[in-house]
Amino acid sequence: FDLINNRNFYKNGSDKFMKFYSRKMVAAKDLNSNGSLFGGRLLAWIDEEAFIFTTCQLKDPSVVTRYISNIEFLSTARIGDIVEIGMEVVDMGRTSITLACVVRKKGTEKIITQIDKIVFVLVGHDGQPKPHYQKVKFIDEAI
């Protein structure tokens, strides 16, 4: 993703723009033994935000995380820093939705991590995938 004019949008190769709606402040409880943001805490934030984004898109909270692609931590955050989590839909399957995610530090817009694929699957009461019958919506329309 490339930062566009230092704004709150990232542009990927298909000319889509990613918006950042979720922010978290790094607190003492979020730090590792090195004094920086614990990777596990960040992954929990990402999974939670992806769940919220997905349920808004599919209009159904009966989703499970199926897959998260490779994660590389490119930079870190420290106590008091604000991190922003951006999501966008990259694919919509019959029972699934695939998202891309960028996490950056507010103010510097330095990327902490980016994830190319987070896949959620809509499931029925039996735990089996079920069709969602939804089309991609922009986040403004979904929330």
Predicted regions and their residues:
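A contiguous binding-surface segment within folded domains or other stable secondary-structure elements
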Residues: 52-91
